[in-house]
Amino acid sequence: MAMAEPQDPKKGDKKTAERRGGGWLSRIAPGVRGAFAKRETPENLWVKCPDTGEMIFRSDLEAALWVTPAGRHMRIGPEARFKFTFDDGQYEALPTPPVVEDPLKFSDGKPYKDRLVAARKATGEPDAMAIGYGKVGGVDAVVLVQDFAFMGGSLGMAAGEGFIAAAKAALERQVPMIAFTAAGGARMQEGALSLMQMARTTLAINELKDAALPYVVVLTDPTTGGVTASYAMLGDIHLAEPGALIGFAGPRVIEQTIRETLPPGFQRSEYLVEKGMVDRVTHRKELPEVLGSLLGTLMMGRKRQAA
């Protein structure tokens, strides 16, 4: 009887090797695990519509100028404003003057200086005002944008200096000025120094008027408090984005004070157009064309007066 050839114990048989984890399964396992592994998703990939709760791709919102399918004009920062307002998105960023920070050494549980640091980190802006210079509808213009993301767009010394710097730039270049407003009011951390900016910005607007240079205001959501009581309502023409809250005190404060229910849409831009406080409600995508047309007409009238 023939004897079976002894098997090399080092090699073993194929099945034994596979059972020990050296077969085909071990070769494909990494790929299988990779296919089903949890993938990292960017946190800001989606944005929730505040009206409908719908989740919207951030890229789609950016393409729509941050207007939701439901028509909500969402709050946006200076860079986005500049890019769609200026012709071909081309503009020169103008500096805002530095100011003394935290002169009152204010703290409301958190030091004011710490709040400034946090706001700058979140927005990438030195304060609530940003200035750009370029062409709007073919007309040279200085554009000022108030950033609500920076401490509620509040009006403080830096914001006041920013507004005055924009007005000076318009005067030096003899061009019109556009202001996009968005604020909760004066910056409480600066006390009376903040309230002073209401008078200072008003004087800057008077200089524009004395030079017969157009000053156009675009009221965005929200524009309230001391900003409404000063430069936001001193324009030659007032445009407003749809649904923007515009007023001095907020509706809840008013209701609590007068103890009456306010009418629907009270203090919204559409309501204010009906009452004559705003000249026109303009969709964000139409703003560049409308602004360009207004500036062209106003500057043409200025040239005729000069002649």
Swiss-Prot record:
Record flagged with keyword Lipid biosynthesis: yes
Domain CoA carboxyltransferase N-terminal per the UniProt entry, residue ranges: 45-307
Catalytic activity: N(6)-carboxybiotinyl-L-lysyl-[protein] + acetyl-CoA = N(6)-biotinyl-L-lysyl-[protein] + malonyl-CoA
Keyword ATP-binding set for record: yes
Alphabetical UniProt keywords: ATP-binding, Cytoplasm, Fatty acid biosynthesis, Fatty acid metabolism, Lipid biosynthesis, Lipid metabolism, Nucleotide-binding, Transferase
Pathway(s) annotated for this protein in UniProt: Lipid metabolism; malonyl-CoA biosynthesis; malonyl-CoA from acetyl-CoA: step 1/1
Protein EC: 2.1.3.15
GO BP annotations listed: fatty acid biosynthetic process; malonyl-CoA biosynthetic process
Enzyme class: transferase
Any one Gene Ontology molecular-function term assigned to this protein's record: ATP binding
Gene Ontology cellular-component terms listed: acetate CoA-transferase complex
Bias type Basic and acidic residues, positions: 7-21
Predominant localisation class: cytoplasm
Chain residue ranges for the region called Disordered: 1-26
Localization of this protein: Cytoplasm
Pfam families membership: Carboxyl_trans
Assembly and interaction partners: Acetyl-CoA carboxylase is a heterohexamer composed of biotin carboxyl carrier protein (AccB), biotin carboxylase (AccC) and two subunits each of ACCase subunit alpha (AccA) and ACCase subunit beta (AccD).
Family: Belongs to the AccD/PCCB family.
Role played: Component of the acetyl coenzyme A carboxylase (ACC) complex. Biotin carboxylase (BC) catalyzes the carboxylation of biotin on its carrier protein (BCCP) and then the CO(2) group is transferred by the transcarboxylase to acetyl-CoA to form malonyl-CoA.
This protein's name: Acetyl-coenzyme A carboxylase carboxyl transferase subunit beta
Organism annotation: Caulobacter vibrioides (strain NA1000 / CB15N) (Caulobacter crescentus)
Gene: accD
